[in-house]
Regions:
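Switch/coupling segment of Walker-type NTPase motor domains
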Residues: 373-374, 379-451
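Short, mixed-charge, low-aromatic patches
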Residues: 47-54, 226-232, 354-359, 379-383, ...
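Structured core elements
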Residues: 13-15, 80-82, 166-168, 257-259, ...
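N-terminal pre-Walker A segment at the start of P-loop NTPase domains
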Residues: 352-373
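Short acidic/polar alpha-helix capping motifs at helix-coil junctions
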Residues: 56-61, 363-367, 389-390
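Active-site-adjacent structural elements in folded domains
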Residues: 238-244, 368-372, 392, 397
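Extended, folded cores of ATP/NTP-driven motor/assembly subunits in large transport
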Residues: 1-351, 445-451
């Protein structure tokens, strides 16, 4: 990514309601329900990974513009979920999220700032120990919500401090699958993993395409009574299955950054270690891949990349959609982690039979679309109550209706015990209607009102 791609981005706050059905409390159903809900986010990432990766001289010089950032942030004592996306891809991402999370609310917000003027800032990348094609453990193999450990670590951050887990993503080029499939194919032909890796890709392709595996195996069986074909262990068979499963999924190039801000160096180091240790649950130590921290020497460069959401090739890794969904998904209804920024009230789609004429009451915004809400004149003859506590906009709402009536030439009667609303309404009266105004002022002792 380049500096130019860091600007012109939309920062979206995504919130979901906490709704737990009674039947979801049954333990046998909970695990299945967890996997189904996390699977929704896998579908979102799979769609993103299926987009053709940008390439060519323009992408190389100016940087790829198909970057997306998914972030879990502790800011102002709340754990919030953000998506940062270019305006070009915004509608596409919103549609994908709403398709899987119909009750999610996505709203534009200004960028957050977890840093304080005197805070201590630490950051680290999370990278693979082995090649990208080796898989890690995903939510399908975990008994609990894979993100509970991450959000629990974030919930321990004190008020006034902050932290962010940032995933900067872009679609991976399709050739990333090739190496993993070649490794799996070589092991299926009776070779050890170490032998396949030592042989190298070119030799392996030649070996597979010429079908020499079967010839060599038969020759060795004739030569030696017991044969010398290597027999795979059950765990090695699982490894082959994992390699093939990862290669069958949509792939995303990722930078995983963890940045913390605290009042003291000791607290900052503790916060960082707690978050990084939460990634151990995804490790498959011997027959798969592991995640490890990689703290750059130039912390200022990393923090700058974090702020501008830049992609750094030197710390990249390739995750399948399933692996990415295991590390980032919207909070589940069963999540009990404190400080989650839940959606407390949902927005509903306006009814399709909204009147197209009448006085304008306001605008209803739903999933990026604005709808005019109007009231017909016949309905206004009924009693209407405007209820709400001080400061929520009752007088402003009434003043808007009064202004529309005055501008339309209709008659208006306003009784205001305070007088502020009357003063505001008088400003709406045009010169040509000045003679239409009758003002009853109880404070005018020269013209007392008879009650």
């Amino acid at each position: 990514g380049s500096w130019s791609t860091s600007f012109g981005m939309s920062i979206l706050l995504v919130r979901v309601p906490k709704e737990l059905r009674k039947e979801d409390n049954v333990q046998d159903k909970t695990q299945q329900q967890i996997q189904e809900l996390i699977g929704r986010m896998e579908t979102v990432f799979a769609t993103m990974g299926s987009v053709k990766a940008e390439n060519g001289i323009v992408a190389w010089v100016l940087g790829r513009k198909d970057l997306m950032a998914f972030e879990i942030v502790v800011h102002k004592d709340k754990i919030s979920f953000y998506v940062t996306i270019s305006k070009k891809l915004r509608q596409f991402i919103e549609e994908q999220i709403h398709a899987q999370y119909p009750n999610a609310q996505i709203e534009d917000v200004s960028d957050y700032n977890i840093f304080a003027p005197t805070s201590v800032i630490l950051g680290s990348y999370v990278v693979f120990k082995r090649a990208d094609y080796f898989p890690i453990k995903t939510y399908r193999k975990l008994e609990t919500d894979s993100m509970n450990s991450l959000t629990n670590a974030l919930s321990k951050i004190d008020s006034g401090d902050g932290a962010s887990i940032q995933y900067v993503l872009r679609a991976a080029h399709k050739h990333w699958r090739r190496d993993g499939l070649m490794i799996a194919k070589g092991m299926q032909q009776g070779k050890r993993l170490s032998d396949v890796e030592r042989q190298g890709l070119l030799g392996l392709i030649w070996y597979v395409m010429r079908g020499l595996g079967a010839i060599i195996t038969e020759h060795n069986k004739d030569k030696t009574p017991g044969g010398n074909t290597y027999h795979l262990s059950p765990l090695e068979n699982d490894m082959i299955k994992g390699l093939e499963e990862k290669a069958s999924k949509a792939g995303l190039e990722a930078n995983i950054r963890v940045v913390v801000s605290a009042k003291t160096p000791e607290k900052a180091q503790r916060y960082l270690n707690d978050i990084l240790n939460s990634y151990c649950q995804f490790n498959i130590y011997e027959y798969g891949n592991s995640l490890t921290k990689k703290m750059p020497m130039l912390q200022t460069r990393m923090i700058r990349h974090f702020i501008f959401r830049r992609f750094d090739e030197s710390f990249s890794l390739i995750l399948s959609a399933e692996e990415m969904a295991s590390m980032f998904h919207l909070p589940l209804p069963s999540t009990e982690t404190p400080k989650i920024n839940w959606l407390l009230s949902r927005k509903a789609l306006p009814p399709p039979n909204l009147p197209s004429e009448g006085i304008l009451l306001g605008l209803s915004e739903y999933r990026g679309h604005k709808y005019e809400v109007r009231m017909k004149s016949g309905d206004r003859r009924r009693h209407m109550y405007v209820i709400g506590k001080s400061g929520v906009g009752k007088s402003v709402f009434q003043a808007s209706m009064i202004k529309q009536d005055i501008e339309a030439g209709r008659g208006v009667c306003v009784i205001d015990p305070h007088g502020d609303l009357i003063d505001e309404c008088l400003e709406y009266v045009p010169k040509e209607r000045a003679d239409d105004v009758i003002l009853f002022d109880p404070a005018d002792f020269e013209r007392p009102l008879g009650l």
